[in-house]
């Protein structure tokens, strides 16, 4: 594999790491950077390029798992948390616990099992991604405006099971390509009277198991498309996504309490305009599908 192609793999890993957990839609950015510019499918083949995107997404997922490892250890009662007082479901009282995460995962898990192939076949196109980007941006703006009326927002350890389920429903809705899982769930958390940082924490903590299961299953189904001659491309992309993902998640969690969601929403609208100009004005990206 040529050096230029390896550099492209690193670039795509960086883009994935920057955007997977930010409320800006990693799908929209992959369309812009890969499908419209770098075009990994031209030197990997369409199925191998699709598999590569699964691999770099896993890099971002592992970054999220690392950032929130202490929370997972606490919920699973592992390590230094194994001797702490627990309640009836194996967790400390009045804390975010494993049942919150399970309840939040149910909607996306069920819909993913039932409709993932349908979504990939019928909803994954440039116009539908642009629709998801735009509607998601409006939802984020609405959430930010509403948050100004909340006088005593909840933190992540005050969330109840009903709120966890509702946020999980919004994660399921975000299966529409371009809508953005984090944009949808953070906005819903804010509408459920959580502060922005806590809504982001819960979003990421809940998203990692869902994404790990979904990406892991997809990778198993597509392992045959990973060729040893391309292994360097996959490894560099994965590492880039993991390292950049670590930095991006920590930076986002610092920024979200200060700038809220509207700046990200405006960015999404600008992204829609750029993609629309390239797609409708210049015909770039015509025929893009999920696989």
Curated annotation (Swiss-Prot):
Q: Where in the cell is it found?
A: Cell membrane
Alphabetically list the UniProt keywords.
Antibiotic resistance, Cell membrane, Cell shape, Cell wall biogenesis/degradation, Hydrolase, Membrane, Peptidoglycan synthesis, Transmembrane, Transmembrane helix
What Enzyme Commission number does this protein have?
3.6.1.27
GO CC annotation: what is one?
A: plasma membrane
Q: What class of enzyme is it?
A: hydrolase
* Catalysed reactions, semicolon-separated: di-trans,octa-cis-undecaprenyl diphosphate + H2O = di-trans,octa-cis-undecaprenyl phosphate + phosphate + H(+)
Gene Ontology molecular function: undecaprenyl-diphosphatase activity
Where would you say this protein principally sits, based on its record? membrane
- Write down the membrane topology: Multi-pass membrane protein
In its UniProt record, which GO terms are filed under biological process? cell wall organization; peptidoglycan biosynthetic process; regulation of cell shape; response to antibiotic
Question: What does this chain do?
Answer: Catalyzes the dephosphorylation of undecaprenyl diphosphate (UPP). Confers resistance to bacitracin.
Q: Any additional notes?
A: Bacitracin is thought to be involved in the inhibition of peptidoglycan synthesis by sequestering undecaprenyl diphosphate, thereby reducing the pool of lipid carrier available.
- Any idea what this protein is called? Undecaprenyl-diphosphatase
Query: Gene symbol?
Result: uppP
């Amino acid at each position: 594999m040529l050096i230029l192609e390896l550099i492209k793999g690193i670039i795509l890993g960086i883009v994935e790491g920057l955007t997977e957990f930010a409320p800006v839609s990693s799908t929209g950015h992959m369309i812009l950077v890969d499908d419209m510019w770098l075009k990994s499918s031209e030197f990997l083949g369409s199925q191998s390029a699709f598999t590569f995107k699964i691999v770099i997404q896993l890099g971002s997922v592992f970054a999220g798992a690392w950032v929130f490892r202490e929370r997972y250890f606490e919920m699973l009662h592992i390590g230094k948390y194994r001797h702490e007082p627990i309640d009836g479901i194996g967790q400390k009282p009045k804390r975010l616990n494993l049942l919150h995460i399970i309840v939040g995962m149910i909607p996306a898990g069920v819909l993913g099992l039932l409709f993932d192939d349908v979504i990939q076949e019928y909803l994954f196109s440039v116009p539908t991604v642009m629709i998801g980007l735009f509607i998601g941006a409006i939802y984020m703006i609405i959430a930010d405006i509403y948050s100004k009326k909340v006088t005593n927002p909840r933190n992540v350890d005050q969330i109840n099971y009903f709120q966890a389920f509702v946020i999980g429903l919004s994660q399921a809705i975000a299966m529409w390509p371009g809508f953005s899982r984090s944009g949808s769930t953070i906005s819903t958390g804010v509408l459920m009277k959580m502060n922005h940082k806590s809504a982001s924490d819960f979003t990421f903590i809940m998203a990692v198991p869902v994404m790990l299961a979904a990406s892991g299953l997809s990778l198993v189904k597509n392992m045959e498309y990973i060729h040893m001659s391309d292994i360097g491309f996959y490894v560099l992309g994965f590492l880039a996504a993991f390292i950049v993902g670590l930095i991006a998640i920590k930076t986002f969690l610092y920024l979200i309490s200060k700038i809220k969601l509207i700046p990200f929403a405006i960015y999404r609208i600008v992204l829609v305009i750029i993609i629309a100009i390239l797609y409708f004005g210049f015909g770039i990206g015509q025929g893009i599908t999920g696989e």
